[in-house]
């Protein structure tokens, strides 16, 4: 395992809680780096992470009320509203289709994944000793010809692919 404090960056494909929901806990456990994502994903995370914290705090309150009667130990939520709101300062917003360089030898580009507003697949180029390799993280990929969401961008080549495969 990697300690959260040893991680420099999070590259976030989209705001759905199964992808973003653990970020406040990582920050609580020591992550202090940048969370790099698209503009819309950062904006949606503002709403969704606060909502997740609210649900967790409500659940903890309910469990503790019931648990006290049964003599159970206090239930503590994974993170609080303050934790969720504090994470927002770590977000770095990035436009689609622009190559950014978060560190020496690392280039990153977000392309539209067509899954929801702000969703992306992420292309990463790593250069070391004049050797360049490309890694693609698909994220959740949307469908073609949807009325409100753009079609996903096709990435034609990569040395390595990490593919979302829930369905």
Model-derived segments and their meaning:
Residues 1-11, 20, 27-167:
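His/Asp/Glu-rich metal-coordinating catalytic cores
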